[in-house]
């Protein structure tokens, strides 16, 4: 479900050994967007209670990024997400937004 949710299925099917393909250190043979997808899948596979992300989809195109954000923020998932991102779509999916400037909270709003 995690691999499907972060849209890695077709990429994994294209690998010579599928999930058993050996990846070089730091994933140097992978695109930056696929690296982010792998990291996202790994972060959710064990269904944690809390997720911390920093620009988790910034290397993906907007449509794919938004679809993955929709999946990560779906109501069926019972985790709390704390995210720092420049992508405004995260705001649409949030119930609380904290804005910081120069290390200080300048806005704390519940939606």
Regions found by a protein language model. Name each.
Residues 93-110:
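H-loop (His-switch) and adjacent beta-strand-loop-beta switch element
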Residues 1-22:
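Conserved "ABC signature" C-loop
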Residues 51-55:
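Catalytic Walker B motif of ABC-type/P-loop ATPase nucleotide-binding domains
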Residues 40:
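Hydrophobic anchor residue at the start of the ABC signature
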């Amino acid at each position: 479900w995690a691999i499907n949710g972060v849209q890695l299925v077709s990429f994994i099917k294209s690998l010579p050994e599928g999930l058993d393909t050996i990846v070089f250190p730091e994933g140097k043979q992978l695109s930056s967007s696929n690296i982010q997808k792998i990291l996202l899948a790994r972060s959710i596979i064990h269904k944690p209670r809390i997720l911390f992300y920093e620009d988790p989809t910034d290397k993906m195109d907007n449509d794919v990024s938004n679809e993955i954000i929709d999946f990560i923020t779906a109501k069926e998932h019972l985790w709390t997400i704390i995210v720092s991102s420049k992508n405004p779509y995260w705001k649409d999916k949030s119930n609380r937004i904290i804005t910081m400037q120069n290390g200080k909270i300048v806005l704390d709003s519940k939606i």
